[in-house]
Amino acid sequence: MKLCDFEVGLDQPLFLIAGPCVIESMQLQLDVAGKLKEITGKLGINFIFKSSFDKANRTSGTSFRGPGLEEGLKVLDAVKKQIGVPVLTDVHEYTPMNEVAAVVDVLQTPAFLVRQTDFIKNVCAAGKPVNIKKGQFLAPWDMKPVVDKAKSTGNEQIMVCERGASFGYNNLVSDMRSLSVMRDTGCPVVFDATHSVQLPGGQGSSSGGQREFVPVLARAAVAVGISGLFAETHPDPSKALSDGPNAWPLDRMEELLETLMELDAVTKKHGFARFA
């Protein structure tokens, strides 16, 4: 599949979607995007910057949600033009899709909205590549009907993203079998290594996370075989305004990505045959 100006798939090297969870300021986004461009350029990784203008599903109603649509699009447009990288953001049911699609290169649907038929179709009808996150409550094989809805709009640029499955209260687990199962949708599969270590609502008024397991799950996913990796990162996760507990430190991204690219090359060298 053609994504931005590069090809993605199991016959292509791993690509990266990364950036801060939420747009905190113009300068932070430019700094992080610039550093990620430097790292990915050095390692030969195709890179898409991500950040959200509105986090509509925060645990607490008083938590920081972002700058909003107008200011958020200005920031994303600045990142795209000044840093020279494609950009991704997530959209919601109330989002003016065409307005967002005029700025960003890739649209993303939140996991909690994966079963909302009209929403999925409206996003995909905007004509941009779409990264559809699998709901924490959804079986991997149930992504096939979601993809069918998406492609019924005529948009063939659809990706599916694994971000963990609910496992009791305030906990997620990653079933690596789902990465193989979701290949049957015919779409590139992306693994979200940071939201997969989230502890939803685990801190009462906010979500917790187990950042130390990001490289564990990322390595496992790459070893199974994926097209892309999604990872939220921040210069100081302890001060991040959203999802800090599961964000990977920016100054440790290069070492993580270097390892993952080596694993990716080995995995894809040996193919993905199914065994009955």
Swiss-Prot record:
Keywords: Cytoplasm, Lipopolysaccharide biosynthesis, Transferase. It catalyses: D-arabinose 5-phosphate + phosphoenolpyruvate + H2O = 3-deoxy-alpha-D-manno-2-octulosonate-8-phosphate + phosphate. Coiled coil: none annotated. The keyword Cytoplasm applies. GO terms for molecular function: 3-deoxy-8-phosphooctulonate synthase activity. GO terms for cellular component: cytosol. This is 2-dehydro-3-deoxyphosphooctonate aldolase. It comes from Xanthomonas campestris pv. campestris (strain ATCC 33913 / DSM 3586 / NCPPB 528 / LMG 568 / P 25).
